[in-house]
């Protein structure tokens, strides 16, 4: 569970740093208020990084997701995909502020960003697999607890 906490904290730090970088870089270069991918990085990192891992942390506390192989796949693949996607946003944003349109730049940028999105998707599929497994075990535990409570009630009634 601590991996999810540290991932959330790391993405929080990166998200806040991205916001400061955008503000200071655009002021420094005279591009304040210019729309670019840099202006979106802050919220993307906070939502897809920090908030995602805080939600995963809560799910892990209930469903013990961290014990599953599919969760490990999710953790590393999702983080890698988010990192690739964010780096490509950074590159595209810097190029945009430099006056280059997407048509003027390499086709590799959207291609690599697409690979980042594919990694994010694979990670999310692995997360859903871990959640499904966790829900199945959680339902079994609830049914067993309900059965024990019922047995205790019946024993109490028959004694009384």
Residue map of PLM features:
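Hydrophobic alpha-helical transmembrane segments of multi-pass integral membrane proteins
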Residues: 1-160
């Amino acid at each position: 569970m601590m991996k999810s906490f540290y991932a959330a904290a790391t993405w929080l730090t990166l998200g806040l740093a991205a916001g400061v970088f955008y503000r200071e870089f655009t002021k420094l270069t005279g591009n304040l208020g210019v729309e670019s991918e840099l202006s979106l990085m802050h919220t993307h990192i906070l939502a897809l990084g920090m908030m995602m891992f805080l939600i995963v942390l809560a799910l892990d506390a209930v469903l013990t997701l961290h014990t599953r192989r599919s969760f490990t796949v999710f953790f590393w693949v999702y983080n890698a995909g988010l990192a690739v996607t964010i780096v490509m946003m950074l590159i595209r944003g810097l190029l945009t502020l430099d006056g280059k349109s997407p048509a003027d730049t390499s086709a590799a940028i959207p291609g690599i960003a697409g690979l980042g999105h594919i990694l994010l998707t694979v990670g999310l599929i692995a997360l859903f697999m871990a959640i499904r497994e966790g829900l199945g075990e959680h339902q079994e535990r609830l049914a067993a607890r309900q059965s024990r409570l019922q047995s205790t009630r019946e024993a109490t009634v028959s004694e009384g």
